Protein backbone atom coordinates (compact mmCIF):
# COMPACT_ATOMS: atom_id res chain seq x y z
CA UNK A 1 0.00 0.00 0.00
CA UNK A 2 0.88 3.68 -0.09
CA UNK A 3 1.34 5.77 3.03
CA UNK A 4 0.76 9.52 2.74
CA UNK A 5 2.34 11.70 5.42
CA UNK A 6 1.45 15.40 5.47
CA UNK A 7 4.12 17.72 6.83
CA UNK A 8 3.47 21.29 7.97
CA UNK A 9 5.68 23.97 6.42
CA UNK A 10 6.18 27.73 6.28
CA UNK A 11 5.42 27.80 2.56
CA UNK A 12 6.94 27.44 -0.90
CA UNK A 13 10.54 28.27 -0.05
CA UNK A 14 10.66 25.70 2.75
CA UNK A 15 8.97 23.12 0.54
CA UNK A 16 11.58 23.69 -2.16
CA UNK A 17 14.44 23.34 0.33
CA UNK A 18 12.99 20.05 1.60
CA UNK A 19 12.74 18.61 -1.89
CA UNK A 20 16.35 19.57 -2.61
CA UNK A 21 17.71 18.34 0.74
CA UNK A 22 19.20 14.86 0.27
CA UNK A 23 18.70 14.14 3.98
CA UNK A 24 14.98 14.95 3.84
CA UNK A 25 12.54 12.24 2.75
CA UNK A 26 9.98 14.64 1.23
CA UNK A 27 9.07 13.39 -2.26
CA UNK A 28 6.26 15.72 -3.35
CA UNK A 29 5.35 19.29 -2.38
CA UNK A 30 3.41 22.35 -3.48
CA UNK A 31 5.61 25.17 -4.77
CA UNK A 32 4.38 28.56 -5.97
CA UNK A 33 5.40 29.26 -9.57
CA UNK A 34 8.27 31.74 -9.69
CA UNK A 35 9.68 30.67 -6.32
CA UNK A 36 12.42 28.49 -7.84
CA UNK A 37 13.81 31.24 -10.10
CA UNK A 38 17.61 31.16 -9.83
CA UNK A 39 17.70 27.86 -7.88
CA UNK A 40 19.32 24.66 -9.20
CA UNK A 41 16.34 22.32 -9.49
CA UNK A 42 17.66 19.67 -11.89
CA UNK A 43 16.53 16.82 -9.60
CA UNK A 44 12.91 18.02 -9.56
CA UNK A 45 9.98 17.69 -11.96
CA UNK A 46 6.66 19.49 -12.29
CA UNK A 47 3.53 17.35 -12.14
CA UNK A 48 1.48 20.34 -13.29
CA UNK A 49 -0.39 23.38 -12.03
CA UNK A 50 -3.21 22.81 -9.52
CA UNK A 51 -4.80 26.23 -8.93
CA UNK A 52 -4.26 29.99 -9.00
CA UNK A 53 -2.77 31.78 -5.99
CA UNK A 54 -3.65 35.42 -6.75
CA UNK A 55 -1.70 38.39 -5.45
CA UNK A 56 -3.88 40.73 -3.41
CA UNK A 57 -2.50 44.19 -2.68
CA UNK A 58 -4.57 45.89 0.00
CA UNK A 59 -3.94 49.45 1.16
CA UNK A 60 -5.39 52.13 3.40
CA UNK A 61 -6.42 55.62 2.34
CA UNK A 62 -9.07 57.47 0.40
CA UNK A 63 -7.11 57.77 -2.85
CA UNK A 64 -7.58 54.99 -5.38
CA UNK A 65 -4.28 53.40 -6.44
CA UNK A 66 -3.68 51.17 -9.46
CA UNK A 67 0.13 51.05 -9.80
CA UNK A 68 2.77 49.69 -7.43
CA UNK A 69 4.92 52.78 -8.05
CA UNK A 70 2.30 54.69 -6.05
CA UNK A 71 3.43 52.82 -2.92
CA UNK A 72 6.72 54.73 -2.71
CA UNK A 73 7.13 56.23 0.74
CA UNK A 74 4.72 53.70 2.27
CA UNK A 75 5.10 51.01 4.91
CA UNK A 76 4.56 47.77 2.97
CA UNK A 77 4.15 44.29 4.48
CA UNK A 78 5.86 42.09 1.88
CA UNK A 79 5.84 38.69 3.62
CA UNK A 80 7.98 36.95 6.20
CA UNK A 81 11.70 36.41 5.62
CA UNK A 82 12.30 33.39 3.39
CA UNK A 83 8.69 33.15 2.19
CA UNK A 84 7.54 32.79 -1.40
CA UNK A 85 5.28 35.81 -0.84
CA UNK A 86 8.28 37.98 0.00
CA UNK A 87 10.29 36.79 -3.00
CA UNK A 88 7.52 37.56 -5.50
CA UNK A 89 6.47 40.81 -3.80
CA UNK A 90 10.03 42.16 -3.89
CA UNK A 91 10.36 41.09 -7.52
CA UNK A 92 7.30 43.12 -8.53
CA UNK A 93 8.22 46.11 -6.38
CA UNK A 94 11.75 46.16 -7.81
CA UNK A 95 10.30 46.20 -11.33
CA UNK A 96 8.45 49.36 -10.29
CA UNK A 97 11.48 51.05 -8.74
CA UNK A 98 10.28 50.49 -5.17
CA UNK A 99 12.91 49.22 -2.72
CA UNK A 100 14.10 49.60 0.85
CA UNK A 101 15.43 53.08 0.06
CA UNK A 102 12.07 54.37 -1.16
CA UNK A 103 9.70 52.46 1.16
CA UNK A 104 9.65 50.66 4.50
CA UNK A 105 9.48 46.95 3.60
CA UNK A 106 8.07 45.10 6.60
CA UNK A 107 8.81 41.35 7.06
CA UNK A 108 5.18 40.54 7.84
CA UNK A 109 2.87 38.04 6.16
CA UNK A 110 -0.53 36.40 6.51
CA UNK A 111 -2.69 37.38 9.47
CA UNK A 112 0.22 39.28 11.05
CA UNK A 113 0.28 41.57 8.01
CA UNK A 114 -3.51 41.92 8.17
CA UNK A 115 -3.31 43.02 11.81
CA UNK A 116 -0.59 45.54 10.93
CA UNK A 117 -2.75 47.08 8.19
CA UNK A 118 -5.86 47.17 10.37
CA UNK A 119 -3.85 48.63 13.25
CA UNK A 120 -2.37 51.37 11.02
CA UNK A 121 1.13 49.92 11.46
CA UNK A 122 1.35 49.27 7.71
CA UNK A 123 0.00 51.23 4.75
CA UNK A 124 -0.19 48.30 2.32
CA UNK A 125 0.13 44.51 2.37
CA UNK A 126 0.93 41.82 -0.19
CA UNK A 127 -0.99 38.57 0.24
CA UNK A 128 -1.10 35.45 -1.91
CA UNK A 129 -3.99 33.01 -1.66
CA UNK A 130 -7.55 32.23 -2.67
CA UNK A 131 -10.43 34.60 -2.04
CA UNK A 132 -11.53 32.25 0.74
CA UNK A 133 -8.32 32.49 2.78
CA UNK A 134 -8.92 34.05 6.20
CA UNK A 135 -6.34 36.80 5.64
CA UNK A 136 -7.77 37.89 2.29
CA UNK A 137 -11.38 37.49 3.43
CA UNK A 138 -10.93 39.72 6.47
CA UNK A 139 -9.54 42.58 4.37
CA UNK A 140 -12.15 42.30 1.61
CA UNK A 141 -14.74 43.18 4.26
CA UNK A 142 -12.63 45.66 6.27
CA UNK A 143 -13.69 49.30 6.41
CA UNK A 144 -11.18 51.84 5.14
CA UNK A 145 -9.20 49.18 3.24
CA UNK A 146 -9.03 49.05 -0.57
CA UNK A 147 -7.99 46.31 -2.99
CA UNK A 148 -5.66 47.51 -5.73
CA UNK A 149 -6.69 46.78 -9.32
CA UNK A 150 -3.37 46.48 -11.16
CA UNK A 151 -3.30 48.55 -14.35
CA UNK A 152 0.04 46.92 -15.28
CA UNK A 153 -1.25 43.34 -14.87
CA UNK A 154 -0.88 42.45 -18.55
CA UNK A 155 2.67 43.80 -18.55
CA UNK A 156 3.54 41.71 -15.48
CA UNK A 157 2.15 38.57 -17.12
CA UNK A 158 4.37 39.14 -20.16
CA UNK A 159 7.51 40.08 -18.23
CA UNK A 160 7.17 37.26 -15.69
CA UNK A 161 6.15 33.92 -17.30
CA UNK A 162 5.09 32.47 -13.94
CA UNK A 163 2.30 35.05 -13.58
CA UNK A 164 -1.16 35.08 -15.16
CA UNK A 165 -3.54 38.03 -15.49
CA UNK A 166 -6.87 37.46 -13.73
CA UNK A 167 -10.11 39.38 -13.33
CA UNK A 168 -12.09 39.32 -10.11
CA UNK A 169 -15.60 40.21 -11.33
CA UNK A 170 -17.73 42.80 -9.57
CA UNK A 171 -19.78 41.10 -6.85
CA UNK A 172 -17.95 37.76 -7.16
CA UNK A 173 -17.07 37.64 -3.45
CA UNK A 174 -20.44 38.85 -2.14
CA UNK A 175 -23.26 39.86 -4.50
CA UNK A 176 -25.48 41.11 -1.67
CA UNK A 177 -22.85 43.60 -0.49
CA UNK A 178 -21.38 44.03 -3.99
CA UNK A 179 -17.83 43.01 -3.06
CA UNK A 180 -15.80 43.99 -4.95
CA UNK A 181 -17.74 47.03 -6.12
CA UNK A 182 -16.04 46.90 -9.55
CA UNK A 183 -14.05 44.45 -11.68
CA UNK A 184 -10.55 44.11 -10.21
CA UNK A 185 -7.51 43.09 -12.25
CA UNK A 186 -5.01 40.88 -10.42
CA UNK A 187 -1.95 38.80 -11.25
CA UNK A 188 -1.39 35.29 -10.03
CA UNK A 189 1.29 32.64 -9.80
CA UNK A 190 0.08 29.05 -9.75
CA UNK A 191 0.47 26.31 -7.18
CA UNK A 192 2.71 23.70 -8.80
CA UNK A 193 2.82 20.07 -7.71
CA UNK A 194 6.54 19.27 -7.67
CA UNK A 195 8.11 15.83 -7.28
CA UNK A 196 11.64 14.56 -6.76
CA UNK A 197 13.06 12.57 -9.69
CA UNK A 198 13.04 9.43 -7.52
CA UNK A 199 9.22 9.46 -7.17
CA UNK A 200 7.74 6.21 -8.54
CA UNK A 201 5.67 6.57 -11.76
CA UNK A 202 2.73 4.74 -10.16
CA UNK A 203 2.65 7.33 -7.37
CA UNK A 204 2.71 10.13 -9.94
CA UNK A 205 -0.37 8.64 -11.61
CA UNK A 206 -2.24 8.35 -8.30
CA UNK A 207 -1.36 11.92 -7.32
CA UNK A 208 -2.58 13.31 -10.63
CA UNK A 209 -5.83 11.34 -10.49
CA UNK A 210 -6.46 12.72 -7.00
CA UNK A 211 -5.59 16.24 -8.18
CA UNK A 212 -8.07 15.90 -11.03
CA UNK A 213 -10.83 14.89 -8.63
CA UNK A 214 -10.12 17.76 -6.22
CA UNK A 215 -9.09 20.67 -8.46
CA UNK A 216 -11.08 20.30 -11.68
CA UNK A 217 -14.19 22.17 -10.50
CA UNK A 218 -14.99 25.76 -11.46
CA UNK A 219 -14.11 28.64 -9.15
CA UNK A 220 -14.03 32.42 -9.08
CA UNK A 221 -10.96 32.47 -11.32
CA UNK A 222 -11.01 29.13 -13.12
CA UNK A 223 -13.21 27.35 -15.62
CA UNK A 224 -14.35 23.72 -15.12
CA UNK A 225 -11.54 21.36 -16.06
CA UNK A 226 -8.91 24.11 -16.29
CA UNK A 227 -6.87 22.41 -13.56
CA UNK A 228 -4.80 20.38 -13.09
CA UNK A 229 -2.82 21.06 -16.25
CA UNK A 230 0.73 20.64 -17.50
CA UNK A 231 3.02 23.50 -16.60
CA UNK A 232 6.77 23.97 -16.43
CA UNK A 233 7.63 27.60 -15.70
CA UNK A 234 10.23 26.57 -13.11
CA UNK A 235 10.61 22.81 -13.50
CA UNK A 236 10.56 20.46 -16.51
CA UNK A 237 7.30 18.55 -16.82
CA UNK A 238 7.62 14.95 -15.65
CA UNK A 239 7.37 12.49 -18.59
CA UNK A 240 4.82 10.51 -16.54
CA UNK A 241 2.75 13.66 -15.99
CA UNK A 242 3.02 14.56 -19.67
CA UNK A 243 1.59 11.14 -20.58
CA UNK A 244 -1.23 11.64 -18.09
CA UNK A 245 -2.25 15.01 -19.56
CA UNK A 246 -2.12 13.63 -23.10
CA UNK A 247 -3.76 10.24 -22.56
CA UNK A 248 -5.44 10.23 -19.13
CA UNK A 249 -5.37 7.22 -16.83
CA UNK A 250 -3.16 4.23 -17.71
CA UNK A 251 -4.97 1.75 -19.99
CA UNK A 252 -5.36 -0.92 -17.28
CA UNK A 253 -7.14 1.56 -14.95
CA UNK A 254 -9.82 2.61 -17.44
Describe the predicted segments one by one:
Residues 56-58, 185, 192:
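Residues embedded in well-ordered beta-strands
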Residues 3-6, 16-17, 44, 74-82, ...:
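Second-shell loop/turn segments in exported
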Residues 2, 20-24, 94-98, 118, ...:
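Sec-exported extracytoplasmic/periplasmic mature domains
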Residues 1, 53-115, 119:
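Bilobed "Venus flytrap"/periplasmic-binding protein-like clamshell domains
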Residues 100-188, 199:
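Pocket-lining segment of extracytoplasmic ligand-binding domains
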Residues 2-73, 77-80:
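Short, glycine-/small- and polar/acidic-enriched structural segments
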Residues 108, 112, 129-138, 147, ...:
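An extracytoplasmic/periplasmic, membrane-proximal ligand-sensing/linker region
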Residues 8-12, 47-51, 69, 78-86, ...:
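Solvent-exposed, acidic/flexible segments
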